[in-house]
Structure formats: C-alpha cells, structure tokens
Amino acid sequence: MRFLTTPWARGRRAAAADRRRASPTVTVAVCTLDRRDQLERTLHALRSLTYTAFEVVVVNGPSTDGTAEMLEGFDHSLRVATCGVAAIGASRNIAVASAAGDLVAFIDDDAIPPPNWLETLLPAFDDPLVGAAGGAVFDVPLGRVDWQLCTCTRLGAGNTDSPGPISRYLGAGADPVAYLAGCNMMIRRSALQQVDGFNPLLTGAYDDVDICCRLNDAGWGIAYVPAAVVRHDRAPNLTRDDQQTIRDPYRILASRAIFAMQSTVAPDETAVVAMLAESLREWTVFADQQLAAGHLTPDEHQRFVEQAEAGARDGLAAGRGPRLVTVIPDPPRHLFRPYR
C-alpha cells in the first residue's frame, strides 16, 4: 500500500472544502450488469429521495440484455458511463471518476433505498475525519436485516453482525477491520482520491472490504449508521443463481486471495495459502452436498470444483503483484446534474 504526500494533501484540502458547503453535493453511483428491469426500478426509486443536492451516475458494464437501450430512453436526468469489463472494482472507479459530487453514495442495481437515505448518512460527515459511512441491509430473500456492523479479517473472513462498538475495529492495521456493505455506503470523494480508488483486480467480491480497509489504514474514520437501511433483492449474477445458491465460486476465491495478499504491507503468504486450502475444502464439501441433493449434475459439480481451484490459484498469482493504482481525477463539477 502506498501513500503519497501530494494525494494526501489534496485529499485534506478537498475535505476542508466539503466542510465549507452547507449542503454537500452527492453522487449516487449505480454499477450495473445485465439487470435491466431491476436497474430501472432502482432508478425510479431514487426519484423519491428527499435530499435534493444529488446526481445519479450509472456505470453500465458489458450488458447484453437491453440495459444500454433502456438508459438511452430513460426520461430522467442522469449521467451514464460504460465499463468494458465485468469487474466491480473497475466499474466503481469509473463511477468515482465521473462523480461531480462531494460525496459518492453507492447502491446496487437491485437495491431500494428509503426516501431519507441520504439525509440519514450525511450527518456522519460533520466529523471531518470520517471518510465513509454506511448502514444496514435488509436482505429481501431472507426477510430480515442481514448486514449490520460488518468486519473482516485481513485474510478475508467476514462477519456481517459483529458486536460493537465500531471503534474496536478501527485504527491503522486493525484486524479484523470494519467495513461497509457495498450496496449501502457513502464515501468522501476526496478520500477515494487520496487512496487511489478501488482495487480494479477485485472483479466480484471484497471491493467494499478493501476500500474500507485502505481508508482505515490511511487514517480516515468509518461510521456505521444503523438507521440507514437499504432493501437488497440479491438478484442473480455471475456467481449465484435465482435461488441464492452459489454456482461459480471463482470470483469469490480469486477476490479473497487478492485481498488477503494486498491488505497489508507485508502479507504472510504462508497464512494466505493455508487459508485458501481450507476455503477450497469448504467449497468442495458444499459442492458435494449440492450434488447429493440433486442441485448439481456430476458435470456441474466437476466444473464447480475446478472453478474454485482456478479462483484460488489465479487470485494468489494476481495478489503477489503490486496493487494496481487508479488515479482519480479532480471532480468534474461542471457536469453536476441534479436528479429529478
């Protein structure tokens, strides 16, 4: 992890400018991939937000389901960017670079916020040292709040209902470290600029853990606001099916390996390898259970195990390299377009 004097100073100056604004501007960022109908519902829900100083930026991945056409014909003011790869880290960086607001609020394309969502999160930023704030997530398929005070070890073992207070999980090198759910987090743009944005190697998981980890290690505070609850449908994606069952663990294991290798200055590769071996055993047991229950065919079972092994192998190799640096430009404030 690298910290340069210039980005640090620039980040602090920008944070000071944020504080001078009575009503900070917010960019609501929605990264999407092949979820045309869910995205359209989310965009309509954002019209009900009661905070007025916000814009919406949609980053469309390589969708093939008519998402681009829907966005072209959408009858409300929003800005659209594209991401040529199916990778959440890269997509979030495009959203941040496009954001004209002082703060960037991330919500998933299959999530619905309450009308007071932004107002509930904003007071956390009255503290100039807070770099990120987020709330709880109501898991619609489970029918309950499932993401509350989230923490994760530097080896990628997560807990979405950790005992408080959050201060137990903050401070340089904290392990486990507090993080915010990626579908319900607001981050100071200047802080994102300082830490070089999201890790583009993280294609489908641990992007939220990684950004909070690096913000924490850079000295920024992280606030958990339990009253800010977002409803999350957890629609099918490249990893899970419509029954919420993991069908391809590649991205999970690859992203976990990358995070574990790059979450500290001097990673313990022996510990990472041991963690991956145990994780592979657990995923193999899961695949065996799915096969026995008739949810996987023998061919699907074989592919599942092969994908798990490939994810661990490829993630470890990628994690050994340097973290890719994304230079976040200054905000294009002239492009700010209030969402109506």
Where are these regions (language model features)?
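Short aromatic/hydrophobic "clamp" motif used to bind/position activated sugar donors
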Residues: V104
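Glycine-rich, basic loop-to-helix element that forms the pyrophosphate-binding segment
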Residues: T82-A99, G171
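A conserved acidic beta->alpha catalytic loop
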Residues: A45, T52, N60-E69, A111-I112
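Conserved donor NDP-sugar-binding/catalytic core segment of glycosyltransferases
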Residues: P115-T153
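Non-catalytic, C-terminal membrane-associated alpha-helical segments of glycosyltransferases
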Residues: D268-R340
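Short, flexible, basic/aromatic active-site loop/helix in glycosyltransferases
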Residues: T153-V177
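N-proximal low-complexity "stem/linker" segments adjacent to membrane-targeting elements
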Residues: M1-R47, R340
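A short, conserved alpha-helix in the catalytic core of glycosyltransferases
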Residues: Y179, C183-D196, L201-V229
